[in-house]
UniProtKB/Swiss-Prot annotation:
Gene: ispD
Transmembrane segments: none
NCBIfam families per record: ispD
Site, Transition state stabilizer: residue positions: 16, 21
Keywords: Isoprene biosynthesis, Nucleotidyltransferase, Transferase
Functional summary from the UniProt entry: Catalyzes the formation of 4-diphosphocytidyl-2-C-methyl-D-erythritol from CTP and 2-C-methyl-D-erythritol 4-phosphate (MEP).
Site keyed Positions MEP for the nucleophilic attack: positions: 151, 207
Domain of life (superkingdom): Bacteria
UniProt xrefs under InterPro entries: IspD, IspD/TarI, IspD/TarI_cytidylyltransf_bact, Nucleotide-diphossugar_trans
Catalytic activity: 2-C-methyl-D-erythritol 4-phosphate + CTP + H(+) = 4-CDP-2-C-methyl-D-erythritol + diphosphate
Protein's UniProt name: 2-C-methyl-D-erythritol 4-phosphate cytidylyltransferase
Listed pathway(s): Isoprenoid biosynthesis; isopentenyl diphosphate biosynthesis via DXP pathway; isopentenyl diphosphate from 1-deoxy-D-xylulose 5-phosphate: step 2/6
CDD domains in alphabetical order: CDP-ME_synthetase (cd02516)
Main enzyme class: transferase
Amino acid sequence: MSGAVALVLAGGSGTRMGRPKQFIELLGRPALYHTLRAFQEAREVERIYAVGEEERIRDLASGCGIDKLCGCARPGESRALSARNGLLLCGEEDGVICLIHDGSRCLVTPQLIGRVVRAVEEGADGAIPAVPVPDTIKVADGERVLKTLDRSSLRAAQTPQAFRLGLLRRVFSAPEEVLREATDDASLVERAGGEVRLVPGERTNIKLTSPEDLVLAEAILAARERRGSRL
């Protein structure tokens, strides 16, 4: 075991869904259960911390055998501010690898978790899963197309994103206005001049953002259950 820690961000209000998406049931269990279960099963992860409703998350974990959960933090006003709150729980050892993950990415697998941890162990400042962008991407001004981007160099970033704790503490000490604008953790490391390595992501590792995503996620979970595998 490498002794990595996982920080799961589960404090979203679910504005677009009309309810907190991390607690929407998929196959009879909250989406967050499926997220936590992947980190519970990942041999590289020693401890799990979460950002969100502490009582609700602890009840979920204790009722489902998630015994790696070690603490919960209150959400912040933005994703990065929530992550900063959670990092306060993760310990003072600079060399420990920390994986920051969107709680609504409930289809993450232990195999993907292992890949990002290994990339940091091999020397990268950070590692993020990413997949090629299959669609043609247009830059638009309202309804007017300004230009077409070369998709061969484009990648869609996913989570979990892995970094050493010491580096995370440094980059999350940036001013709050910088943190509010950050849409992922790697962008803060990039801003500080760090090397972020891409590892193969998984197209099934979707983020729940629309009702259609719920249908797709439940179908993928059901297929995995039939196979007896998280792959």
